[in-house]
Amino acid sequence: VSSAASDVYKRQDPSSRQHGTAHILDLCEAQWVCTLPAHHVTSGCWSTRGKQLVLGLQSGELLQLTPEGEVKAMLPPLPESERSLYVEDVQWLENHAFLVTYNTCPPTAEHNQEPVHEYEVFMIVRDPKANTMTYSAFPLDVAPPFGDTSRWPCRYACTLRDWMPMKHIVFMACSASTDVGVIGFRHAWEALELEDTSRPVLPFSSQDETSDTGPVALALDLSSTDSVPDPNAAAKGEDPSATLPAVPILYVYTNDGVLLAYHVIFTEAEAPYPGMVSIESNPAFSPSALPAPTIPQPSSTPAP
């Protein structure tokens, strides 16, 4: 939906009264709409049509509900896990398909605890007729924590849909990783390997030019109108100066204050990306300062 957004603001102090609550903010009306009936929320994502959303919980469960707070379904946590896991990130890709990243729950709730980066990435597919769930693990994490592991865990993801022959292309980054990985679905889900010269890699810190940097935001720009050079023009026997139609731009903002931009070029694409949009000259709304949402006191009644 154009008037709503999904994001998670993490607090290092779990004792905070606002810890784990979820709120709906209407961006067009510039007002808080409601507080959702969920506790210990760790992540969230809108459905593809923006009519519902799914919240990942500290218990490892997924709560599906409407923006008005009506609970539609509860998806169980990862079965037979030897560790206590919470939902670090959830991407609602199709009506019954969820890309979920789990992380190990910290052993304590102390403020000075060490960050934990023990991720597991799963594709969860729900069969509504048989009322069953299929959990399929990715053998490798495409955004492993091989960078600054002193940063608090956070997963970032954004998706391109129906860029045939790929049904889904998911870019994924981790707060403790220096790379941006890619997961795709053509005939099956798989981690996509990019050439070294084409792989998004975050630069060293501008402070000392040796320290790793990590992402703090990841987004796609679908409004570009500029053509881009075709990297395979010469290999195809075409004019080396040949260009491709405008493509999506992947933005990565780092903790060093650097904004990186990458053209997303799909060399096997059957046509330009169908999700490109045009930007109106006048914005639909102008954001204004908002008061903080009113947080109700915790109730003794368990959440639905």
Please name every model-derived segment.
Residues V1-A5, Y9-Q12:
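Single conserved hydrophobic/aromatic residue that forms the stacking wall/gate
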Residues S3, C45-G50, Q91-N95, W163-M166, ...:
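Loop/turn segments within WD40 beta-propeller blades
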Residues R17, Q31, G44, Q52-L53, ...:
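Intrinsically disordered, low-complexity Phe-enriched regions
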Residues R17-A22, K51, S59-L62, A97, ...:
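Loop/turn residues immediately N-terminal
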Residues R17-V33, E61-M74, I124-T132, G184-W189, ...:
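Per-blade loop-tip surfaces of WD-repeat and WD-like beta-propellers in eukaryotic adaptors/scaffolds
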Residues S43-C45, D89, A217:
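Conserved beta-strand position repeated once per blade in WD40 beta-propeller domains
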Residues C105-T108, Q113-A303:
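Eukaryotic scaffolding regions of large macromolecular assemblies
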